[in-house]
A protein has these predicted regions:
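A short, surface-exposed loop/turn module that caps and links secondary-structure elements
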Residues: 34-61
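Arg/Lys-rich, positively charged N-terminal/basic patches that mediate binding to nucleic acids
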Residues: 1-33
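Enriched for short, Lys/Arg-rich terminal
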Residues: 12-16, 20-23, 59-91
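Generic structural motif
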Residues: 4-5, 48, 69
Length: 91
């Protein structure tokens, strides 16, 4: 069961991230540690999905409509790659 999350790569970014987003991110980490990744993926509210293109092999969750946490699975651990703000595409 995958239930460990490594956030070392994004610790500095989280200091600049809005507090409600950080709280939601911490809730996701808590859920992973308590229930494991497979169970948390079943929760539709996180919108856990695979990424395509230059982020192929990575997964993401929605923290809200504008913010995502991007992660990869390495062995029995989740490594957070980035917590990013998504901007609407210009048409």
């Amino acid at each position: 069961m995958i239930n460990r999350v490594d956030i070392r790569a994004v610790e500095k970014d989280l200091l600049k991230t809005p507090k409600p987003i950080v709280i939601k991110f911490q809730k996701w980490i808590y859920d992973i540690e308590q229930f494991g990744l497979e169970e948390v993926r079943k929760v539709r509210g996180w919108h856990d999905h695979t990424l395509k293109g230059n982020r192929a092999g990575q997964r993401a969750i929605y923290l809200n409509k504008q913010w995502r946490a991007v992660y990869v699975i390495e062995g029995t651990e989740i490594k957070i790659v980035k917590v990013i703000e998504v901007h609407p595409h210009a048409y």
